[in-house]
Amino acid sequence: MNTNEAIQVLVVGSSGATGRLLVEELLARGCRVKAIVRSPGCFPESMTGNETLSLIHASVLDLSDADMAVHASDCVAIVSCLGHTLSFKGIYGQPRRLVTEASRRLCNAIKSNRSKVPTKFVLMNTTGNRNRDLDEPISFAQSCVIGLLRLLLPPHVDNEKAADYLRTEIGQKDNAVEWVAIRPDALINEDGVSEYELHCSPIRSAIFDSGKTSRINVAHFMADLITKEVVWDKWKGQMPVIYKKDDALA
């Protein structure tokens, strides 16, 4: 018997490059997946024909609180792979707080369902965002660049605020929500999972010396968080950084 059959996961941002890989990985592990997608054609037929995948055609912020609570119900975990598209409208248009607002509303949906056990919330974030729960060193030059990014690129602020919401408003002792915010470095595409390293904090500059992280490795780690309690217990309430193993100290 597949021990993952009882695991149901809600994925938002599943039409993105990493989100699709996560859905594929979860299905391969025998999990049941609900995926909120704006476009019904974002998944290949080989995936949509899977009886354990349920597609919800909607924009996540357009859902009512009641609908969001229904979609979140019976889910062991909720994963946000949301991001802003790399276009002028995606970067400077509305909603400028897509990731933050979706995280807040999804966590509120979890709380409203009053589950007897905490629900896992996994956020895909970025190494450009510091974990302010830790004393992560940052150079003056990088601090200046980050300051400019906050002024010029609204998505960077959105990523910061989403993680800050989990750190400060959900915190470490919430009875309903446990969380992990994953910080990949420069994302690349690869065909298969390779060895990767996980660190509590960045081991190289995200601005001046960024490492590489394959999307499929990020998806693999997120799936491990959901399906392996020993992995979850190690990283819950933290913001792990993920690098390709051969690139971590290159």
Q: What feature does the model see in each segment?
A:
Residues 12, 36, 78-82, 121-127, ...:
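SDR active-site strand-loop-helix element
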Residues 163-189:
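Conserved beta-loop-beta element that borders a ligand/cofactor-binding pocket
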Residues 131-134, 191-196, 227-237:
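Glycine/proline-rich active-site loop of Rossmann-fold NAD(P)-dependent oxidoreductases
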Residues 34, 89, 104-153:
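Conserved Rossmann-fold NAD(P)-dependent oxidoreductase catalytic core, especially the SDR/UDP-sugar
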Residues 9, 35, 41-42, 47-105, ...:
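NAD(P)H-binding glycine-rich loop region in Rossmannoid oxidoreductase-like domains
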Residues 92-100, 138-141, 148-161, 208-216:
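Short-chain dehydrogenase/reductase
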Residues 2-31:
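N-terminal Rossmann NAD(P)H-binding glycine-rich loop of SDR-like oxidoreductase domains
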Residues 2-3, 17, 205-250:
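Mid/C-terminal beta-alpha module of Rossmann-like enzyme folds, strongest
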